[in-house]
């Protein structure tokens, strides 16, 4: 399953607020479609699937990528669900979004893919790069790169930069100063349901 490129508000109407996907709010609170307002009891599978979809759409990863992250999270010590969230939060595109360099995760990914971002002084165009403590993320010393980032920083997607990131706004750079904690994740999600969803599939 490839990355979603369709109408984003249809997704937020079905799944709820996804800060990484879009900053717009849906006008209608019920799911799209002919039977969107119908009340029906959801199965346990449907609830788990919905939580999984929240994660996939918010961080803009494909199904195949998410499966890889689940496997990696299982191999690490500690809670699989928390490990999974940390892996997704540490992606370079998401870190750029949390810093305000991009208005959304897809917007931040475009900055990375087009070579506007450096990590430790080197241009890095791999959105899935795992940021770690000590890494310095900066906007490239080019007029077009700076203009894009400065424009986005005026209206960031999220109000607050998480404590594990230290932003120097005038210099358009930031440092990863610690590990991302569970409570700093902006998405409302039950990650245990995501782990349960994949328990029989992976």
From Swiss-Prot:
Disordered: annotated segments: 15-42
Quaternary organization: Part of the 30S ribosomal subunit. Contacts protein S5. The interaction surface between S4 and S5 is involved in control of translational fidelity.
Organism: Synechococcus sp. (strain WH7803)
UniProt cross-references to Pfam families, sorted A to Z: Ribosomal_S4, S4
SMART domains from the UniProt entry: Ribosomal_S4, S4
Limits of the S4 RNA-binding domain: 90-152
Upper classification of the organism: Bacteria, Bacillati, Cyanobacteriota, Cyanophyceae, Synechococcales
PROSITE patterns with a match to the protein in the record: RIBOSOMAL_S4, S4
A GO cellular component entry from the record: small ribosomal subunit
Molecular function GO labels: rRNA binding; structural constituent of ribosome
NCBIfam families: PRK05327.1, rpsD_bact
Function: One of the primary rRNA binding proteins, it binds directly to 16S rRNA where it nucleates assembly of the body of the 30S subunit.
Family the entry assigns: Belongs to the universal ribosomal protein uS4 family.
UniProt keywords, alphabetically: Ribonucleoprotein, Ribosomal protein, RNA-binding, rRNA-binding
Gene (name only): rpsD
Protein name: Small ribosomal subunit protein uS4
Gene Ontology BP, a term: ribosomal small subunit biogenesis
